[in-house]
Amino acid sequence: MEIKLEHVSKKYGRHTAVNDVSITLSSGRIYGLIGPNGSGKSTTLKMMAGLLFPTSGFVKVDEEQVTREMVRQTAYLTELDMFYPHFTVKDMVNFYQSQFPDFHTEQVYKLLNEMQLNPEKKIKKLSKGNRGRLKIVLALARRADVILLDEPFSGLDPMVRDSIVNSLVSYIDFEQQIVVIATHEIDEIETLLDEVIILANGEKVAQREVEDIREQEGMSVLQWFKSKMEVC
């Protein structure tokens, strides 16, 4: 599978959230979409998922223009809590199973066990860290072609972040899936990434292979990001 954003722009009224961005994503690769708050990361992810359509430009999947059907092929983790608070964890699992044919029930219970989440516990009684874990569990339990994670580490303590990174390593299909992680927690994901894309002020600043950054620039991804932001 290949996803292409071709000269994509998105406006909300007079505000331009994304401006003339072109990106190509291929199966079997993990991408870091990084940038400061308000750089257009979330809007870009939503256009990749078919949840938003561009004001101009095209989003294509295998050369076909993206439609709402793309949502069915995409596991999208929003930075917002989208849970029904009166549900238990098990209720939420059953809801996802009813909505997504690619939802893997056996895998979800393995993940719940690894994340130390009690299926019988009410969502409203989960800590912020455990709600973050549950969002990751529900995303990774799908056998989706595309996994889009919007700020998966936001507000979580280092121990929770480590458990999430370990789950990503264990449950992502590194041969078949496209994975995009939008974050400003760059150090947490550097070891996972194949490529990094920098957005700033709604525009693509750079896209580079992580290996090239290390070998040719002699920098970590965070150092490279900071050097690019200095000239923006």
Curated annotation (Swiss-Prot):
Residue ranges constituting the ABC transporter domain according to the UniProt record: 3-226
Keyword Ribonucleoprotein attached: no
Listed CDD domains: ABC_DR_subfamily_A (cd03230)
Nucleotide-binding listed as a keyword: yes
An example Gene Ontology molecular-function term: ATP hydrolysis activity
Keywords, sorted A to Z: ATP-binding, Nucleotide-binding, Transport
SUPFAM superfamilies named among the record's database cross-references: P-loop containing nucleoside triphosphate hydrolases (SSF52540)
UniProt-listed InterPro entries: AAA+_ATPase (IPR003593), ABC_transporter-like_ATP-bd (IPR003439), P-loop_NTPase (IPR027417)
Residues annotated as binding ATP: 35-42
Family classification: Belongs to the ABC transporter superfamily.
Descriptive protein name: Uncharacterized ABC transporter ATP-binding protein YhcG
UniProt lineage: Bacteria, Bacillati, Bacillota, Bacilli, Bacillales
